[in-house]
């Protein structure tokens, strides 16, 4: 992926010099990770590139000058966006001032579509080429937004294999560059704490690792349902133990409070997600890119994502993809076929689907 992707950014405006300034806009923890790896690869190829913009601590460590750590506002759903709207307006104005006062060679957007649509519009207003790395999943819902993509984005860099054709068929300059998670899995092999991994594997009991998400809002909405599942499993399968893989200390502190109130015996770790995935007998994970990581490790997994009735009703009418889980979307011969599949929990998946999906 890295060689394929970084070559795209070589002199996007046709400049005769390799000195470049690239503005990044990243607002989610996973995007922070992908952005940091992209920045490292770019600086490895040319250390005269200057990276600046919105991102997180990982991008900063990789060499990006942050105007603000936007990952702390990784919000979801319309109401939560409205509550933080004044902040996003301020960040967008800050970006536009920066575009006016500096010579920017390219803008790189990673995920975070609501805010990044605005950044793309402001960048195009100043004649700056815009690259969208990890394009919005317009094929899944609200496909009419493709007009924004055509108008505001110069290059759509796709992480999923079926996305390139979908975007090209709708008039976008698109290229499949591969999913960064698989590069990151290879890199993780060098940083795995083997002693911790060995201790987990040698501890008696079947380890079930809980992965309730990387966004704070996600953890707060999902973890209590994970703990209900733990209660059920403990009651039915005595030879089990549980661990929560927290993205940061704030989420670990939140998890500690819920676990203490529940009376359950669950260990909580920060920064041990790869080890806990590999050591697990199975995992309970929040829906998202983590399913690809678990597929890479061949770890049996149940994907859980709880929404209230209104959100379920809304999603049921807006979502246009056949499946929710990324593993299923990649495996399916036709991820866009709009049919209602129903599986019984005790039956294996049908046709080409490794993870049967059903509402509970």
Predicted regions and their residues:
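Nucleotide-activated sugar donor-binding and catalytic core shared by glycosyltransferases
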Residues: 3-360
């Amino acid at each position: 992926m890295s060689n394929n992707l970084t070559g795209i950014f070589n002199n996007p405006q046709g400049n005769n010099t390799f000195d470049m300034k690239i503005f990044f806009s990243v607002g989610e923890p996973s995007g922070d990770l992908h952005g940091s790896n992209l920045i490292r690869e770019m600086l490895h190829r040319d250390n005269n590139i200057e990276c600046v913009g919105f991102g997180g601590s990982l991008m900063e460590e990789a060499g990006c000058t942050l105007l603000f750590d936007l990952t702390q506002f990784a919000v979801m759903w319309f109401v939560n966006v409205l509550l933080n709207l004044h902040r996003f307006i301020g960040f967008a104005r800050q970006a536009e001032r920066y575009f006016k006062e500096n010579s920017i060679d390219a803008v790189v957007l990673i995920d975070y579509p609501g805010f990044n649509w605005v950044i793309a519009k402001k960048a195009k207003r100043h004649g700056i080429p815009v690259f969208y790395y990890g394009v919005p999943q317009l094929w899944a819902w609200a496909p009419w937004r493709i007009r924004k993509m055509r108008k505001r984005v110069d290059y759509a860099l796709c992480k999923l294999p079926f996305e390139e054709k979908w975007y090209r068929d709708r008039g976008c300059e698109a290229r499949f560059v591969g999913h960064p998670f698989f590069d990151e899995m290879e890199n993780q092999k060098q940083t795995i704490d083997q002693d911790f991994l060995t201790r987990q594997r040698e501890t008696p009991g079947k380890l079930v690792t809980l992965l309730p998400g990387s966004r704070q809002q996600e953890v707060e909405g999902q973890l209590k349902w994970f703990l209900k599942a733990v209660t059920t499993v403990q009651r039915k399968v005595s030879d089990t133990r549980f661990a929560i893989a927290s993205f940061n200390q704030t989420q670990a502190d939140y998890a500690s409070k819920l676990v203490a109130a529940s009376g359950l015996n669950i260990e909580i770790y920060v920064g041990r997600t790869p080890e806990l995935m590999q050591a697990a007998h199975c995992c309970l994970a929040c829906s998202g890119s983590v399913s690809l990581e678990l597929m890479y490790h061949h770890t049996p997994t149940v994907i859980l994502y709880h929404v209230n009735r209104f959100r379920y009703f809304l999603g049921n009418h807006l979502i246009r993809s056949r499946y929710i889980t990324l593993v299923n979307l990649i495996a399916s011969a036709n991820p866009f076929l709009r049919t209602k599949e129903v599986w019984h929990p005790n039956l294996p998946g049908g046709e080409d689907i490794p993870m049967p999906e059903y509402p509970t």
